Regions:
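Short, C-terminally biased terminal segments at protein or domain edges
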Residues: 141-159
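Short secondary-structure boundary segments
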Residues: 8, 48, 119-121
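Residues at the C-termini of beta-strands that transition into short coil/loop
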Residues: 48, 78, 150-151
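General small-molecule cofactor/ligand-binding pocket signal
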Residues: 45, 75, 146-148
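C-terminal end-helix/capping segment
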Residues: 125-146
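Short, well-structured N-terminal submotif of metal-dependent ribonuclease cores
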Residues: 1-46, 55-66, 72, 90-96, ...
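Active-site neighborhoods of divalent-metal-dependent phosphate/nucleic-acid chemistry enzymes
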Residues: 72-132, 154
């Protein structure tokens, strides 16, 4: 079964109230559809970075997010993950404020996760940054995960 790292934005979209913003509402619907129909086809993982992010903010929303993440195995944030995150910040480069985003990528890469599922197109699922992220991962000795959104992991017609 393919493996997937669930980044914070996925859990946040699942737990959020329906948005009035059309684009956000469409992403929420796609996320719910993926979670319902495709999630069983993947071994999913999160990291402590995800847990820290989902537990921040409004206590009621944080509880809804925590329930969704419960039972998803936790990847360790090892020294290798920290080193790769630092390399991504320095060599992609990513802004220092994108430390959590770099940690998501690094956790997935260091643990050999095939897909990183996210709605963060600023620093993660970004077509311009993707080749540089892949290069830094490869040069650091890790396979880069496929950085993608739920609609990119909906499967083919013959599935």
């Amino acid at each position: 079964m393919p493996s997937g790292y669930v980044e914070t934005s996925i859990i946040s979209y699942l737990a959020a109230r329906p948005s009035r913003d059309l684009i956000v509402a469409a992403r929420q619907q796609l996320t719910h559809t993926w979670w319902r129909e495709r999630r069983p086809l993947f071994d999913l993982y999160v990291s402590q970075v995800v847990l820290d992010e989902i537990l921040a903010g409004d206590p009621d929303a944080a509880e809804r997010r925590a329930v969704l993440a419960s039972g998803i195995p936790l990847l360790d944030i090892t020294p290798e993950v920290a080193d790769l995150a630092a390399a991504l910040i320095q060599r992609v480069p990513l802004p220092i404020t994108a430390g959590a985003d770099a940690a998501h990528i690094a956790a997935a890469a260091c643990h050999g996760i095939e897909f990183l599922l996210t709605w963060n197109s600023t620093h993660i699922a970004n077509a311009e940054l993707r080749p540089r992220v892949e290069r830094v991962c490869r040069e650091s000795g890790y396979p880069a995960p496929v950085l993608c959104t739920p609609d990119e992991l909906m499967g083919g017609e013959d599935e």
